[in-house]
């Protein structure tokens, strides 16, 4: 498999990645903890993993591997919803057939509008519609339905990355780098949500049963009581 793992890193323990059969490229955040890998680049501690992903794409645009697995750096997380370790998920990906494969097994339906401030991950609200047009994405009908693959960890082909001009990647990088602190979170969440649209080209991710060599059951936000049921207020 012509695949490279690219990981964003700040405080995560990356020892588990030493077992990888694939090359590992590290993009550090400023102030990151020491780790077992030599970073290729260091970026400001902004934009969560998104800034690191964009940095890698910009710096390696002319010599990308056949496929890139973009990951956050932690071996386990609430959004890892396959029944096996993340490395096994990457190893089982059917990249011979598919050019974009989300790795979290976590999907969310979303209407094309600006969401009120009700998500812990986006206390300022999720400005999908506002940012969609501000950043030059093509028109879509108001209120149309998206099916998204959030918490951006995915495998994507060189072909799909190169379908976006390098100057666009640079623009998106600068937008996050230079935004106000108030806008940083909603911009990061926006790119976290729409990475699937950028690479897959569809508003509704087309979930495939043979994305992986193992069987899996897709997990949906609206069917998870831990996300959809409001927590009781503390008194």
Language model segments and positions:
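ER/Golgi luminal nucleotide-sugar-dependent glycosyltransferases, focusing on the catalytic module
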Residues: 1-235
């Amino acid at each position: 498999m012509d695949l490279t793992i690219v990981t964003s890193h700040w405080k995560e323990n990356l020892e588990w990645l030493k077992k990888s059969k694939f090359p590992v490229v590290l993009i550090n955040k400023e102030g990151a903890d020491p780790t077992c890998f030599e970073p290729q680049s260091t970026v400001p501690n902004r934009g969560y993993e998104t800034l690191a992903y964009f940095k890698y794409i910009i710096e390696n645009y002319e010599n990308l591997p056949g496929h890139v697995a973009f990951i956050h750096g932690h071996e386990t997380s609430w959004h890892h919803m396959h029944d096996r370790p993340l490395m096994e998920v990457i190893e089982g990906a059917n990249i011979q057939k598919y050019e974009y494969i989300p790795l979290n097994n976590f999907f969310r339906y979303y209407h094309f509008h600006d969401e009120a401030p009700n998500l812990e991950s986006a206390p300022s609200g999720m400005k999908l519609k506002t940012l969609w047009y501000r950043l030059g994405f093509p028109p879509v009908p108001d209120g149309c339905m998206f099916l998204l693959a959030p918490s951006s960890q995915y495998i994507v082909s060189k072909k799909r990355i190169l379908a976006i001009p390098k100057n666009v990647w640079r623009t998106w990088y600068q937008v996050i780098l230079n935004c106000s602190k108030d806008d940083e979170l909603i911009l990061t969440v926006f790119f976290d949500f729409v990475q699937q649209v950028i690479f897959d080209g569809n508003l509704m991710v087309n979930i495939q049963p043979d994305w992986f060599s193992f069987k899996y059951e897709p997990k949906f936000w609206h069917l998870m009581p831990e996300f959809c049921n409001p927590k009781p207020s503390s008194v």
